[in-house]
Amino acid sequence: MPRYIRAHIPGGTFFFTVALLERKRRLLIEHIDALRKAFASVQAQRPFTIDAAVILPDHLHCIWTLPEGDADFSARWHAIKSRFSRSLPNQERLSTRRSAKGERGIWQRRFWEHAIRDDEDLARHMDYIHYNPVKHGHARSVADWPYSTFHRLVKRGVYAPDWGAGDNVRAMELA
């Protein structure tokens, strides 16, 4: 198996996709408070800024900025996944391999990350994040989805309250 090399950019800004192992489950929104608590706990121990985020039933997307001199997002994701998993009852199916390693069968082992290159790249990824609930059919409009940073960013003037409605959305595919 090829060894994946992660980006190492101290103080960098990154887009992430993290998914449940069983993509038909709805654990992330059914246990949203536990997920928020896991994020807050890790953020208190190993600070990072959440620039944008959306939580869907079976996966999440977010953009983080790490502190100056710090490039270790992997340890943060490991801790978030671990804390969230420990908060849930043991009800998932486990493979022999995961069981032997003492793992839970909740998360996919890996995650996708992309180093944000510039302001345009950041804007494109923020739009992608916030439009994702509509794309996946979980909401009719961006403003209808409660599990994202969209509402916070509307208050800050980054987005108009009706952003994502009708024709005011540019192409949402990421290159």
Regions found by a protein language model. Name each.
Residues 1-175:
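Short catalytic/metal-binding and nucleic-acid-binding patches
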